[in-house]
Amino acid sequence: ILRGLVGSEMCIRDRNEVLRLTQSQVGYSYRAVVSYIDSHGTREVLYTSPSETIDNLDDPVQGEVTIIGEPKEGVTLRALSNSLSDEDGIASISISWETSKDGRNWVGVNSLSGPVLSLNQSLVGSQVRARVAVVDNFGIETNLYSQATRTVANVNNKPSGRIVIRRVGQ
């Protein structure tokens, strides 16, 4: 019987079984303990040296970012990131917005971050997407992107101001 000691956890395994490391073993070391009965009927116990501490392997962020709202001037879009998860835990999530005229080259929307974006005249004719930066509990940052919106449609704005008529000549 192979017994692996992981931190303070005892993992009892059958002969020739492999101990598969999981997230719960990160930060611990382990050793194998082998016990057997020798040919004289005496129980023998062998211990391996402790392993190095188990390092974390970056687990991918699961889920997707969704945009709610119609891509039209004057409308507010909302990026939803509540379906995101990471086996390493999530320390922080930040949302920013990007715009593109061609759907290939993306530029950050200046100084706008957070889950909402108000579509104004400067975004008309562009596609918009949300960029979500997820930092896990081990400090690894992963960027995810929403699907791009359709092109932001223009709204025919009412003219504003006043008309002044001046007489020219006599």
Predicted features and spans:
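Single conserved hydrophobic/aromatic residue that forms the stacking wall/gate
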Residues: 1-12
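Conserved aromatic beta-strand anchor motif in extracellular beta-sandwich/beta-rich domains
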Residues: 8-9, 94-101
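Surface-exposed, flexible coil segments in extracellular/virion-facing regions
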Residues: 13-21, 103-119
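Short, solvent-exposed loop/turn segments at the edges of extracellular beta-sandwich modules
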Residues: 36-43, 103, 135-141
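Terminal edge beta-strands and adjacent linker/stalk segments
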Residues: 45-56, 143-154
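Proline-enriched interdomain boundary motifs that mark the N-terminal boundary
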Residues: 57-67, 155-165
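A short beta-strand segment in extracellular, disulfide-stabilized domains
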Residues: 73-82
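Solvent-exposed loop segments of extracellular immunoglobulin-like
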Residues: 85-96
